[in-house]
Amino acid sequence: MGKRIFLFILTNILVITTIGIVLSVISAATGVGSYIGADGRISMVALLVFSAVVGFVGSFMSLAMSRWMAKMMMGVRVLNPEKDSLTYDEQQLVDRVHRLSRAAGLSKMPEVGIYQSSEVNAFATGPSKRRSLVAVSTGLLHEMDDAAVEGVIAHEVAHVANGDMVTMTLLQGIVNTFVVFLSRIAAWIASRFVSREELVPIVHFIAVIVFQIIFSVLGSLVVFAYSRHREFHADRGGADLAGKDKMVHALRSLEAYTSRIKDDDQTAVATLKISGKRKASLFSTHPDLNERIRRLEAK
């Protein structure tokens, strides 16, 4: 899930920044939708409406693009048994995802993808349960045994069945609203300190972009915290689908993997992987592995 969250947040920041810039330029040129009056004061109601529109449109555009972005950025090759000649391992992967998806009650099977990487990673993404993607790295299939792979895939299918991407999008929309709102207030305050009137619009424009990026990074802490919370639910869902023993085995395999990789590789594992570091941090998308195992065993 970590790779998915990272791509979603990155896409979201780019989208809301682009939308904000376009709307600001249109507003400056036409005066339509401006939240700054002729007297230089901010209309809080107009700014809040503007922020909500940009925030939620941005988050839902990011959701709509999530599957395409994941395929493009990760180089995911979608496995289609009806059109492509698959290897035995690839066919096994497709069959496993479909079997677990049916067990989870999904009416339409997710796309199944694989991408070349030595990293142990898997993620699920997509705008809805009916338009989802479950992808794994070749490194995961190479490093893990069948039972661990089953647990990892069950965990990702549980994310799809739980509708975590849509819930995350709603949360991101709220965060975006605050980001856009606060960044423009901060930019307005900053522009008030500019003595040359002709430079005020330029300073305000640049300050909006800078503050929006800063607040977006800070706002991502809320999304990361929620992501860590949802991981426990996906672990339980994975245990229901594959069995608790396989889910625990998958987590222990991830723990063993993160223990033996080189320190230089640990940074890559920290925020982007299904495992994350063994110890969680504010910027982790996943909680402490030991805590995940403890909670699952106590289930």
Swiss-Prot record:
Active site, renumbered: 156
EC annotation from Swiss-Prot or TrEMBL: 3.4.24.-
Disulfide bridge map: none
Biological process (GO), any one: proteolysis
GO molecular function, one term: metalloendopeptidase activity
Gene Ontology cellular component list: plasma membrane
Signal peptide feature range: none
Binding site for Zn(2+): 155, 159, 231
Cofactor binding remark: Binds 1 zinc ion per subunit.
Transmembrane annotation, as ranges: 5-25, 44-64, 170-190, 205-225
Top-level class of the enzyme under EC nomenclature: hydrolase
InterPro entries, sorted: HtpX_protease (IPR050083), Pept_M48_protease_HtpX (IPR022919), Peptidase_M48 (IPR001915)
Membrane topology type: Multi-pass membrane protein
Cofactor(s) listed: Zn(2+)
Keywords: Cell membrane, Hydrolase, Membrane, Metal-binding, Metalloprotease, Protease, Transmembrane, Transmembrane helix, Zinc
Record localization: Cell membrane
The keyword Hydrolase belongs to this UniProt entry's keyword annotation: yes
Family listed: Belongs to the peptidase M48B family.
Protein name per the record: Protease HtpX homolog
The organism's taxonomic lineage, starting at the top: Bacteria, Bacillati, Bacillota, Bacilli, Bacillales
Gene that this sequence comes from: htpX
